[in-house]
Regions:
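Positively charged n-region of N-terminal signal peptides that target proteins for export
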Residues: 1-4
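Intrinsically disordered, low-complexity segments enriched in serine, threonine, and glycine
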Residues: 8-9
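C-terminal motif of bacterial Sec signal peptides marking the signal peptidase cleavage site
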Residues: 16-20
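Surface-exposed, beta-sheet-biased, low-hydrophobicity segments with strongly acidic/polar composition
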Residues: 22-215
């Protein structure tokens, strides 16, 4: 995120020179409309195939959303308020940042979860644990020349699921569309496929995750 900061700041400066800018920051700040739907969490599950779909709201920069594949639950914590993570969780998302609960991840060369199911875990797959990083928690001071960050553990492999191009306004978000393997802290495995970063109305900050667990 840091490497894009000056590109983003320059682009915002250009936008401010335009005449009437009502609504121009909608895609930048990703403010959900008042009519945003409420159907979040594990919206589909299939016990026979051990698969399902998770739909979460990650529009806020101040919030982590925690997902437990074992319990099929989601929970949130406010970073600014210092709220702690729930007792049970497997991975979490903050905007497009992803972290694990003592786990590690691997990006596959597959295109679908069906290919993961048939191909399995590739021989020699190297899983990457979380590393110390920074995530943006407030964009309000961007025009003043700085952003507010929080230092935390983030998984660099899982966080590659979305490429964010801030060289244009509005930013361009491109999912990798690659299934990822998540090794949980207990040694079990899951396959995750991040399908998109928007809802049906094309509002950014809504993530659909297809999964298989246990793999």
């Amino acid at each position: 995120m840091l490497k894009y900061f000056f590109l983003l700041l320059s682009a915002v400066g250009s936008l401010l020179l335009m005449g009437s800018c009502e609504g121009i920051f909608e895609d930048l700040y990703d403010t959900p409309p008042a009519t945003a739907s409420d159907g979040f969490g594990f919206i589909e599950t299939n016990a026979a195939t051990k698969s399902g779909t998770i739909y979460i709201d990650v529009t806020s920069y101040k919030r982590w959303t925690y997902i437990s594949l074992k319990n099929k639950t989601t929970d949130t914590s406010n970073i600014v308020m210092g709220q702690e993570a729930p007792a049970v969780w497997d991975f979490a998302m903050h905007r497009y940042d992803v972290r694990t609960n003592g786990g590690a991840a691997f990006e596959t060369s597959y295109s679908t979860l069906d290919e993961v199911r048939s191909g399995g875990i590739p021989a020699g797959a190297v899983f990457t644990a979380d590393t110390l990083s920074q995530v943006v928690i407030d964009m309000l001071h961007m025009i003043d020349g700085y952003l507010d960050y929080d230092t935390c553990m983030v998984n660099p492999v899982l966080s590659r699921w979305l490429d964010v191009d801030l060289s244009t306004m509005p930013p361009v978000y491109t999912p990798s569309l690659r299934p990822y393997l998540l090794r949980l802290y207990d040694g079990s495995y899951a396959a995750l496929f991040f399908a998109n970063f928007m809802d049906e109305a094309s509002v950014k900050g809504y993530v659909t995750i297809k999964y298989i667990y246990p793999l």
